[in-house]
């Protein structure tokens, strides 16, 4: 891994100052840097400046609000989220997702904002400079073709974040600040299906906080599969939230990660009102298969990753159904 190239560092004290600093060209936000800095060492980007967000007061705060909702600053560490008593009790899917990221050392530093906004990944992209140059680079960075689908005019690098799908099924919203002020969007709207430009943040915008509503009658869980449990990104990850009314599915949300260029909600309206049985599980598998787009973006085979995604989709809903 190469040494870092030269860049300036700004350390603003307020969100407003951070937004102003990010308005400059070739400037990137920096949280803990557990994803960004290794990529820069590989030559994946050459920013003129990094805006260090760790000095902004209150950005790491986790609090429950008067209406029972949860507010998490984008600077909160994954360790703090995973170990927070209220989150473990009321929003366990979020704690599960945070606790499943990488290893303990990573979680002690890595932030919520960084995990949500992490770069997409691909076996043709996450390589050294000499490896990529010998392969003619790729459409995501410096090249003119996607090696995953050669004739495509878009990048198919895959999003592998764990926390996003959990927040999506919990109906969480993202608070974004930027030159035009503040806006709030559903977490799913932070992303688009484009490996090269998977975030919808505009120039100068940054993620400030996440708000999660009270769970009410919903229960939720997150599960993933990876090669090495200690550190690896998910080959496939699934979050689900369920409302059960007797033997009837009163509400269901399912979100997937590790399969597409963005974490995606699976349209599951066809299952509402029915029982959760083998037929329903097969319907869910078909819906997940239709939503997902597993390609050769990792060294693990496509067929295996697809089978794992379908299997854990059923597993998560099975667990929620049996627990209610």
UniProtKB/Swiss-Prot annotation:
Cofactor-binding details, from the entry: Binds 1 FAD per subunit.
Top-level taxon of the source organism: Bacteria
Free-text function comment from the UniProt entry: Component of a complex that catalyzes the reductive dehydroxylation of 4-hydroxybenzoyl-CoA to benzoyl-CoA. Reaction is not reversible. Is a key enzyme in the anaerobic degradation of phenolic compounds.
Protein's name according to its UniProt entry: 4-hydroxybenzoyl-CoA reductase subunit beta
Annotated disulfide bonds: none
Entry's EC annotation: 1.1.7.1
Activity regulation summary: Inactivated by low concentrations of cyanide in vitro.
Keywords: 4Fe-4S, FAD, Flavoprotein, Iron, Iron-sulfur, Metal-binding, Oxidoreductase
All copies of domain FAD-binding PCMH-type, residue ranges: 2-217
Membrane-spanning residues: none
Cofactor: FAD; [4Fe-4S] cluster
PANTHER family attached to this UniProt entry: XANTHINE DEHYDROGENASE FAD-BINDING SUBUNIT XDHB-RELATED (PTHR42659:SF9), XANTHINE DEHYDROGENASE SUBUNIT C-RELATED (PTHR42659)
Organism of this sequence: Thauera aromatica
GO molecular function: 4 iron, 4 sulfur cluster binding; 4-hydroxybenzoyl-CoA reductase activity; FAD binding; metal ion binding
Lineage of producing organism: Bacteria, Pseudomonadati, Pseudomonadota, Betaproteobacteria, Rhodocyclales
């Amino acid at each position: 891994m190469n040494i870092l190239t030269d860049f300036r560092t700004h350390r603003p004290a307020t969100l407003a100052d951070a937004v102003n600093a990010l308005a400059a060209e070739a400037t990137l936000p920096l949280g803990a840097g557990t994803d960004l800095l290794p990529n820069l060492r590989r030559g994946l980007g050459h920013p003129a400046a990094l805006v260090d967000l760790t000095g902004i007061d209150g950005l790491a705060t986790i609090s429950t609000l008067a209406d029972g909702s949860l507010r998490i600053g984008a600077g909160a560490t994954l360790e703090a989220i995973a170990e927070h008593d209220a989150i473990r009790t009321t929003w366990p899917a979020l704690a599960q997702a945070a606790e499943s990221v990488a290893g303990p050392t990573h979680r002690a530093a890595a932030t919520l904002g960084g995990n949500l906004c992490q770069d997409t990944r691909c076996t043709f992209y996450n390589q050294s400079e000499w490896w990529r140059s010998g392969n003619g680079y790729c459409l995501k960075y410096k090249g003119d073709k996607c090696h995953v689908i050669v004739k495509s005019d878009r990048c198919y690098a895959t999003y592998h974040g764990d926390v996003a799908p959990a927040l999506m099924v919990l109906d969480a919203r993202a608070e974004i600040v930027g030159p035009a002020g503040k806006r709030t969007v559903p977490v799913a709207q932070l992303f688009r299906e484009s490996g090269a430009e998977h975030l919808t943040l505009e120039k100068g915008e940054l993620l400030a906080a996440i708000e999660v509503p009270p769970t009410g009658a919903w229960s939720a869980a997150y599960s993933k599969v990876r090669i090495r449990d200690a550190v690896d990104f998910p080959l496939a990850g699934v979050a689900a939230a369920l409302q059960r009314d007797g033997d009837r599915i009163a509400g269901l949300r399912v979100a997937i990660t590790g399969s597409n260029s963005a974490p995606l909600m699976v349209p599951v309206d066809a299952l509402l009102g029915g029982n959760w049985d083998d037929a329903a599980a097969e319907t869910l598998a078909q819906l997940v298969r239709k939503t997902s787009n597993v390609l050769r973006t990792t060294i693990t085979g496509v067929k295996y990753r697809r089978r794992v995604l379908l299997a854990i989709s059923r597993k998560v809903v099975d667990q929620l159904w049996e627990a209610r």
